[in-house]
Amino acid sequence: MSATSVDTQRTKGQDNKVQNGSLHQKDTVHDNDFEPYLTGQSNQSNSYPSMSDPYLSSYYPPSIGFPYSLNEAPWSTAGDPPIPYLTTYGQLSNGDHHFMHDAVFGQPGGLGNNIYQHRFNFFPENPAFSAWGTSGSQGQQTQSSAYGSSYTYPPSSLGGTVVDGQPGFHSDTLSKAPGMNSLEQGMVGLKIGDVSSSAVKTVGSVVSSVALTGVLSGNGGTNVNMPVSKPTSWAAIASKPAKPQPKMKTKSGPVMGGGLPPPPIKHNMDIGTWDNKGPVPKAPVPQQAPSPQAAPQPQQVAQPLPAQPPALAQPQYQSPQQPPQTRWVAPRNRNAAFGQSGGAGSDSNSPGNVQPNSAPSVESHPVLEKLKAAHSYNPKEFEWNLKSGRVFIIKSYSEDDIHRSIKYSIWCSTEHGNKRLDSAFRCMSSKGPVYLLFSVNGSGHFCGVAEMKSPVDYGTSAGVWSQDKWKGKFDVQWIFVKDVPNNQLRHIRLENNDNKPVTNSRDTQEVPLEKAKQVLKIISSYKHTTSIFDDFAHYEKRQEEEEVVRKERQSRNKQ
């Protein structure tokens, strides 16, 4: 009985031998008997993906069921280690979805447990596997940290070299590529400094290295220690004082204040705007004031003061750059005049020193002497409390025309302005005066008051103005010739001009009688320090130059 069963079993076992069969032979073999073999083989090689191409159809779930388990384990067990380019996707059952990103980001064994990276990175795909060693089970390395072995690469891609301080892979137990820790430490330890020795490139050539503490060598596990100069940190560099910059050469001449800017450039224009008042200074020596001031005030500047103080005063006044510059006057006079911001008669500090400047200027030019002798300018007593009369604002384009109006006792406005003034003069007749409050555009002050003495003669052209476009003329008599800053009159507002200040008026803007009384009172009582008389000689010279140019133009036109 027993012998027969043994022979029967031996005969059946010999007939059913298979190469990879089970250890215990049975009479019948079922499909379920192979599952332990497949499952065991799957567990051993679970981390070895056979995905050489990341774009295979494994992304899509299988549409039919399979009698065997689906996984990525290699079918061959010939003994060669698999080449895991991608991580495993885990056990795939029928109907489950398989996504590529599961292998690329964050899965156990994804990019971290595998020695070689997949083709998404730039490292080569065919490294020499002999350089990795054979210790440890392939694909079953433990991950030391979440980021410990990311971005690793085989040493063969470096030409068979290792990084300073990194032994061979056969002793690496942290599942990291050779030289990873040393490379990270080398990047952290980058310093600024010169390295006296040189680093050896993988091809054997010698190049000088700067700011490297660990370098690559040609030996598999040798270390190259580079003597580095004394380390210098960024903080030490930032703490060093900046190198002193060479000082720019200053112009020769009187010493000015520390950071005073140069005086503004004055452009020479024949029309005589506010930017071109006063003697034209020479370009090479803009700082020397005696030469420009010699024309309007030759004796005034030379006698009381030396030659250099005017040059000192000019930058001191121009450095604050007060809003619109007035006509060109002596800088000390202008500073004294517009430095006062109080009410009328508040120039307690300036009259004793500066106010007499207008008197000595009488000797500057004979024409001015005749005018002062024929007219009593700036009377001490003036009837400003008018019972009847009309007052108008006159805006001039240049102070040259103011000079000629005082010289010839005439004036001319625009065509519209002439009609308005002529109508007012004829309307008042002998009932009251018609006063004109003169101001130059952009000057920042009123320069005087004149009374209209005749109706407008539309058919006559004076031919003395800085521009030839004005037609008609009428006689005027100048009463006040003084510079009154706008801040003395800005509080007076005109109800017939949108309640704007009187200083913000157009040409031939009429001032209501009650407001006109206030303006006349302030102008008459204001103790001025400057006036156009200070530069009268300068405007005389400009007029002579214009006459020469006009005659030359006329002679060319005749030819």
From Swiss-Prot:
This is YTH domain-containing family protein 1. Changing residue 470 to A: Abolished binding to N6-methyladenosine (m6A)-containing RNAs. Keywords: Acetylation, Cytoplasm, Immunity, Phosphoprotein, RNA-binding, Ubl conjugation. Changing residue 401 to N: Increased binding to N6-methyladenosine (m6A)-containing RNAs. Residues 1-50, 238-363 are annotated as: Disordered. Residues 281-295 have a biased composition (Pro residues). Ubiquitinated by the CUL7-FBXW8 E3 ligase complex leading to degradation. Deubiquitinated and stabilized by USP5 by removing 'Lys-11'-linked polyubiquitination. Specifically recognizes and binds N6-methyladenosine (m6A)-containing mRNAs, and regulates their stability. M6A is a modification present at internal sites of mRNAs and some non-coding RNAs and plays a role in mRNA stability and processing. Acts as a regulator of mRNA stability by promoting degradation of m6A-containing mRNAs via interaction with the CCR4-NOT complex. The YTHDF paralogs (YTHDF1, YTHDF2 and YTHDF3) shares m6A-containing mRNAs targets and act redundantly to mediate mRNA degradation and cellular differentiation. The gene is YTHDF1. Belongs to the YTHDF family. YTHDF1 subfamily. It comes from Homo sapiens (Human). It is found in: Cytoplasm; Cytoplasm, P-body; Cytoplasm, Stress granule.
